[in-house]
Every structure is written in structure tokens, then in C-alpha cells.
Amino acid sequence: VDAAVLEKLQAGFKKLEAATDCKSLLKKYLSKDIFDKLKGQKTSLGATLLDVIQSGVENLDSGVGIYAPDAEAYTLFAPLFDPIIEDYHVGFKQTDKHPNKDFGDVSSFVNVDPEGQYVISTRVRCGRSMEGYPFNPCLTEAQYKEMQQKVSSTLSSLEGELKGTYFPLTGMSKEVQQKLIDDHFLFKEGDRFLQAANACRYWPAGRGIYHNDNKTFLVWVNEEDHLRIISMQMGGDLGQVFRRLTSAVNEIEKRIPFSHHDRLGFLTFCPTNLGTTVRASVHIKLPKLAANRDKLEEVAGKYNLQVRGTRGEHTEAEGGIYDISNKRRMGLTEFQAVKEMQDGILQLIKMEKEM
């Protein structure tokens, strides 16, 4: 590892040590011992500990503070990743092994709000990384373009309900751009956390969006992850949304090999998304429960649900609408993760009705 990188690492470590009010998992677990053990290591693609921690060093208000520059980083820098993964994915110990992919009996998922009183929309997404390519910080412009080529040709072969159009961000017309913004489909260049992790290089090369004609199926290409596969619709029919997602993932998987790790499951850029990578969420109005956000958080916590503001992480609830999703992604199957979310949402609705 060259001297300039080591110097930056030392300075970064000092900055973390001095930041007494920093609550990130990076600060909690990057001890002097682990730092000294890892600072000289380099993956075969040339990624160092600096690539792993720089976002968390620059943004001391990070919740987690680390990213994986490539798949090998999860193994090479395991002394730092493993305890952070165990802490975030509560209950997934360093000796545990994530189960094999299992979507389970998809017919057992239901409409959680058949009367349409509470749930505004339902969304299930998963992330995938393409085998043989590193994650954002290590990708070249040529690789971005090559990946886009592979993905867009795979997506354009989808049929039936999944049939749609691929829109590259490069050279996108103002009209198309505005249309995608109005539909809330367009992703922007990364926030300061991703910027600091070097996840936005060569923007917008190789980035794009695919959506089906009904606008219920969406793929983000080379945003935070190589692929974000998303199924969504208005209302509370979780069953329909999940079935659409699983059929899409199965189709894409036939053509594109995904990065998978024996212990950690499907690999993603951010360790919070590992394992199933599945986030099942609803936009939901619970005026009585939500009158007291702490109470809502407490109940949600019992069902391993995460409560966010309307527009996702780091936002407020607009008009009392919350984004509520499964928190656990590791150490359980895709089926179990979505089932846990379904059970929790049904319970929240039941409590709201009884108040």
C-alpha cells in the first residue's frame, strides 16, 4: 500500500479517535489493533482499507460508515466487516452462515389492507451484483458501459408483464428525464455518503433505468449497486408485488451470474443490504399510532420493522405517511424476511383500528 494512502489512513484513524460524539459502527469497531492489522492490506483489484472507511471518516454522522469496494473486501477486511455486520444484522453472528435463496410459497402472501384504508403503496426490492465486476469505487468507465450493455440486452428480452423499455442516463432527453422524475423513478447522483465512498465516478456512464409498461417493475442499473430490482404498485397487495419480483429475479438470473458469498449471501456495496438484500416496504398512514413516533418505533421494533420518513432515509413523515419495512436481511430466507414484514404490518393495522 503506497505511502500517500497510509498517510490518509493514519489521518482518518486520528479523526475518528478524536470524534467523541461519532456514533457510527465504524468508530465502534475500528480498534487500533484492527486498524494496524488491515492498513497494509490490498485486494487483488487494488482496493485498500481507505476505500472501505473513507465515507465514514468524511461523514462522522454515518450510521454504519463502511462500504465494500469489491467482493474480496468482505473476506480480506473481515476483522472489520464481520463485527459490523453482526451488530447491524442483529443476531447474525460471525460464525453464522446465511441460508440459500428461498422465495418460499409465494401464494402465502396477501393484500395486507384489502379495504385500502391505510396502505398507500407497496414495494419490494432486492439488490444484485454481477459476478466478475467490482463495486463502484473500483469500476472503470469501460466496465460501466459493458455492464450496461449486458443488463439492457437481458432486460429487453423480458416478456409478459415485465416487458418494458431501458433508458440510459447518458444522453437522456429533458422530456424523458422529467417524465421519470414525475413517476419518482429517476435516481440522482449519490448523496454525500456515496460521493465520499467514490461510488459516483464517471457519472452518468453506464447508469440507466428500465421499467415495464405498467410502471410496476423497475430496474436501476449501476446506481448504488450494479442492479436494484424493484416491484411496486399502489395499494397493499404484497402478494402480487412479491410474486412479480421473484419471477423477474428468476428470469434475470438465467442470463446474468450474480455475486454470492458462502457465508454472507448475495453481495452488495453496503453491508446493510447483504444476505437476502430484500427490502419490503409500504407507505402507510397510521394517524393514531403515529401521533407518537416513539411508540410507533417501539411497536415496529418488536416485529423487526424499520420506520423511515415518507421519502426514505433521513427524511420526515409527510402528511403522517411513513415508510415501514423489514429490518432483517441476513440469517433468514427471502420468504421469512417478507413474511416478518407482512406479519408486522398486519399487526400495526390491527392496533391502529383498535385505538
Swiss-Prot record:
Catalytic activities = L-arginine + ATP = N(omega)-phospho-L-arginine + ADP + H(+)
Domain annotation Phosphagen kinase N-terminal: ranges: 8-90
Keywords linked to the UniProt accession: ATP-binding, Kinase, Nucleotide-binding, Transferase
Q: What is its EC number?
A: 2.7.3.3
Q: Which residues form the Phosphagen kinase C-terminal domain?
A: 118-355
Query: Can you tell me which residues bind ATP?
Result: 121-125, 184, 228, 279-283, 308-313
Q: Which GO terms describe its molecular function?
A: arginine kinase activity; ATP binding; creatine kinase activity
BP GO terms, sorted: phosphocreatine biosynthetic process
InterPro entries noted in UniProt: ATP-guanido_PTrfase, ATP-guanido_PTrfase_AS, ATP-guanido_PTrfase_cat, ATP-guanido_PTrfase_N, ATP-guanido_PTrfase_N_sf, Gln_synth/guanido_kin_cat_dom
Q: Name one GO cellular component term.
A: extracellular space
Residues bound to L-arginine are G63, V64, G65, I66, Y67, E224, C270, E313
PANTHER family per the UniProt record, alphabetical: ARGININE KINASE 1-RELATED, ARGININE OR CREATINE KINASE
Query: Of which family is this protein a member?
Result: Belongs to the ATP:guanido phosphotransferase family.
Q: What does the annotation say about its assembly with partners?
A: Monomer.
What is the recorded name of this protein? Answer: Arginine kinase
Q: What organism is recorded for this protein?
A: Penaeus japonicus (Kuruma prawn)
